[in-house]
Every structure is written in structure tokens, then in C-alpha cells.
């Protein structure tokens, strides 16, 4: 099978395609906005894969069987401040679908995106993609899943969309498999790292000393427990993960005014108004962003954005290393 990619970004999807099909991509298509993101992938291929930038006058050099894509998901992501129809990041799914289905015409074009693609926030985009597929003689299917179901100790939902060329598949689309594979525990993944390379911590702080919320949990709530003591009693929390602030509010039922009072007593003056703002936001039915220390147990949340900087070693009072 000949395959190619459009907007592969860091390249995980196209590298997986290499393994599936047993050969490198015929070419990579992209736009100038993503050149920096994709330079690592091109270097990995020793700059031997043709790279065509469509908004600089390039075009696809030929037909292939399968094309993959990892368009930016920020337009549909809950992490973004403006998810939905008015986010400019959504143009990329639309553009790539128009170009690949209209010009390249592979047997299959598929991509990965935020889980909201199949929800209310993403309905407008899904409707557009379906119409583009029909206009170009393709059927479409969407697959919602999470890493944990595929044996990866990370709770992260993702959506995958597929366009099937009707000249090959007719009016039918393949039935996609259901998976519920057992996962290796995240603490075992971390503790089984055996290397002397890149073993310096990403975050050089000491969790129990330098994160005031974690210090509050250990010293005030758990009566002087150590990091290891806490790991031993910790139970894995669904979906959001084991971030300390969620544990404080959801498990130990501490509100941010209680936490703020302790912060003031201990001299964390900058945290006091933050605690009050968080208290009021939650009281008004709004959400807050929690980016504090996370102790791994069983599995973790989405390993993106701040996560690598706040995830601890399960047993040692430190944050994970680059190799871990």
C-alpha cells in the first residue's frame, strides 16, 4: 500500500502507518503554518521524503492508497478558550478534506482529533465533513475511543474520522473493532525505566516541599504523611487523574476557603487570592483549571500541556525524569 500524510505534525500517526504498511510515506503535504512542527519528522526521515507545502504553490505529486492527518484539535478542544465554530483552527480539517478527497482521491483518508468532534461542540464540523465526503464520492465513519481501552495507562479520549472511497467500498463502510485491552499500570511503566540517559527531573522541585497544595494535603489533611505514604493509600481517580487539588476537593471535601486559610497561615500570600477566586468560580457552577502535582496510580490523565512538568515518581519524592 502506498501511503502519504497531510499535516502530520510531530509524526506519530505517519510513523505508525510506516509500521502497518511496511514502507515510508510517498510524500508529506502540509501548510507553511506547520513547518516548524514537522521539521523533527523530516529530520527523522533524513529529509529524504518529499515535502510539499500547499500554500506555497506545491501540490500532491501523485496518487496513493491511504492518506493520514493530525489536524490541530484546538478548535474543538475543551482546553481551548474558544472551542467551536468560530475557532480558526477548524479550517484545517475542512481544507485537508477538500484537497485530499477532491485532488488526491485515495482509497482511504483518515485523521485524529479531539473527542468533541462527535459531540455537540463538533456537530457543525462533522456535518461539514460529511457533506465534503458526499460531494467527492466518499462514505464517512467516526470512531470515539480512549487510550485506556487500547492498553495504554492514560485516560485520554480521542476521535478518529475515516473517508472511504465509494469506488472501492461502494455504499458500505467497514465495521470498526471494539477494544478493551488490559493496561500496564502507570507506576510500573515509570519504575521499570532502566537507563542512565536523560534521568534528570523535568521539574527540579520537590513535590512535598515546593507545591503548597500537596504540602497542605500531606501535613494538614493526612497528619504528616510522606510522599510514599500517600501513594500507598491513594486510589486511582476516574477521568481527571490524581491531581492534588482534585483529591483535596473531591475526596477529602476541602473547599478553597479552607485551603486559603492554611495558605495565609503558612505565608503563601500569592495563593490566598487564587484560592478565593477558585472558591467563587466553583460556587457559581463554573470550572477551574487545576495544574498542580499529580501522583501516578494505575493510570494518568492526558499527558499533554502541563502534565509532564507536574507528574511525580510514584515512590520517590520527586518529579519524573525525561527518560521516564
Language model: regions and residue ranges:
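Extracellular/periplasmic catalytic domains that process cell-envelope and extracellular macromolecules
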Residues: 60-61, 152-155, 294-297
Amino acid at each position: 500500500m502506498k501511503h502519504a500524510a497531510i499535516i502530520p505534525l510531530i509524526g506519530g500517526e505517519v510513523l505508525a502507518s510506516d509500521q502497518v504498511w511496511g514502507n515510508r510515506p510517498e510524500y508529506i503535504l502540509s501548510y507553511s503554518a506547520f513547518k516548524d512542527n514537522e521539521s523533527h519528522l523530516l529530520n527523522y526521515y533524513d529529509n529524504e521524503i518529499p515535502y510539499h507545502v500547499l500554500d506555497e504553490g506545491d501540490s500532491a505529486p501523485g496518487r496513493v492508497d491511504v492518506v493520514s492527518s493530525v489536524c490541530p484539535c484546538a478548535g474543538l478542544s475543551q482546553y481551548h478558550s474558544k472551542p467551536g465554530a468560530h475557532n480558526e483552527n477548524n479550517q484545517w480539517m475542512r481544507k485537508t478534506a477538500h484537497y485530499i478527497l477532491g485532488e488526491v482521491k485515495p482509497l482511504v483518508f483518515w485523521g485524529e482529533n479531539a473527542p468533541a468532534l462527535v459531540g455537540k461542540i463538533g456537530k457543525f464540523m462533522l456535518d461539514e465533513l460529511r457533506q465534503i465526503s458526499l460531494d467527492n464520492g466518499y462514505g464517512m465513519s467516526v470512531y470515539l475511543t480512549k487510550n485506556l481501552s487500547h492498553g495504554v495507562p492514560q485516560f485520554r479520549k480521542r476521535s478518529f474520522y475515516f473517508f472511504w472511497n465509494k469506488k472501492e467500498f461502494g455504499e458500505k463502510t467497514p465495521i470498526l473493532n471494539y477494544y478493551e485491552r488490559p493496561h500496564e499500570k502507570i507506576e510500573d511503566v515509570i519504575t521499570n525505566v532502566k537507563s542512565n540517559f536523560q534521568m534528570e527531573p523535568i521539574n527540579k522541585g520537590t513535590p512535598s516541599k515546593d507545591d503548597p497544595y500537596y504540602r497542605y494535603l500531606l501535613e494538614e489533611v493526612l497528619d504528616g504523611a510522606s510522599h510514599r505514604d500517600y501513594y500507598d493509600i491513594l486510589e486511582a481517580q476516574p477521568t481527571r487523574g490524581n491531581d492534588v487539588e482534585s483529591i483535596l476537593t473531591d475526596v477529602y471535601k476541602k473547599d478553597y476557603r479552607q485551603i486559603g486559610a492554611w495558605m495565609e497561615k503558612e505565608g503563601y500570600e500569592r495563593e490566598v487570592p487564587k484560592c478565593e477566586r477558585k472558591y467563587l468560580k466553583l460556587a457559581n457552577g463554573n470550572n477551574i483549571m487545576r495544574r498542580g502535582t499529580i501522583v501516578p496510580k494505575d493510570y494518568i490523565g492526558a499527558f499533554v500541556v502541563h502534565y509532564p512538568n507536574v507528574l511525580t515518581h510514584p515512590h520517590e519524592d520527586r518529579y519524573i525524569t525525561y527518560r521516564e
